Design a protein with these regions (language model features):
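Short, well-ordered alpha-helices that flank and scaffold nucleotide-derived cofactor binding pockets
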Residues: 80, 104, 130, 134
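Glycine-rich phosphate-binding loop signature in dinucleotide/nucleotide-binding domains
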Residues: 106-112
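Conserved donor sugar-nucleotide recognition element shared by glycan-biosynthetic enzymes
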Residues: 71, 98, 125
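A short acidic, amphipathic alpha-helical/loop segment
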Residues: 74, 101, 127-131
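Active-site acidic carboxylates
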Residues: 2-92, 108, 138, 155-162, ...
Length: 225
């Protein structure tokens, strides 16, 4: 059985004060190759991760693979939701960790816990995650904010990164682990994040809001009109 790497016996949970988010190759061209989940869901979750990082003051580093070519540009929501994000241009390296400037940007944060998502999962997410583990980092891979061309490719990649010591997570778990409590001033902003991770959550918010409105305004039920 594989165990999470570089935690030295500690619980494999995200330390917000030690975390940096790496959003790799979430590009409009590559998104067109995704087959393991609906593309709009992938796009929304990648954008949600950027917003999570902003709410939690987590550094964000982005990069793209030849964005001037068929892979296309980064989706704009990422930098819109994380205006503090640092973009690192690569010189053609497929594995972002093979780019010295990218690794230097990670090291410059002084943080050792990486939250990684990338498209395609089996390459853009997996390669740097495995490399970072080998360099001593704690790595959390956000699988449902990383897309690839088939469900089989996703499952194979998940097995591979777990064997390497990477901790797999989903976007909702990342949000909840970082948020920690609803007893905070920005709770409404966190609630909005969940509506992008799973849109049905918006229905819960609307139902709750209406129930409060009925009580507050002593609204007469339709059956009593």
């Amino acid at each position: 059985m594989s165990t999470p790497a570089n935690f030295n016996g500690a619980r494999p949970v995200i330390d917000v004060n030690d975390a940096v988010m790496l959003l790799i190759d979430h590009q409009s061209g590559l998104f067109q190759t995704v087959g393991d989940m609906p593309m709009p869901e992938l796009r929304a979750r990648a954008a949600a991760l950027a917003k999570i990082a902003t709410l939690a003051n987590i550094p964000v580093i982005t990069t793209a693979s030849v964005p001037q070519g068929p892979n296309g540009p980064l989706i704009p929501e990422i930098h819109a939701n994380a205006p503090h994000a640092q973009y690192v241009a690569r010189k053609g390296e497929i594995n972002a960790w093979d780019n010295p400037e990218f690794v230097a940007a990670v090291k410059a944060t002084g943080r050792n816990t990486l939250i990684v998502a990338g498209t395609i999962t089996s390459v853009c997410m997996a390669f740097p995650s495995i490399s970072a583990v080998a360099d001593g980092y704690k790595v959390f891979a956000v699988i449902d904010a990383s897309g690839t061309y088939s469900k089989m490719a996703q499952e194979i990649t998940l097995a591979r990164v777990v064997q390497a010591g990477v901790v797999p997570m989903d976007t909702a778990a990342v949000a909840s682990e970082i948020q920690r409590t609803w007893n905070r001033e920005d709770a409404a902003q966190w609630a909005e994040v969940y509506t992008h991770i799973f849109p049905a959550y918006q229905l819960l918010i609307e139902s709750y809001g209406k129930a409060q409105e009925v009580v507050k305004n002593s609204e007469v039920l339709d059956s009593q009109r």
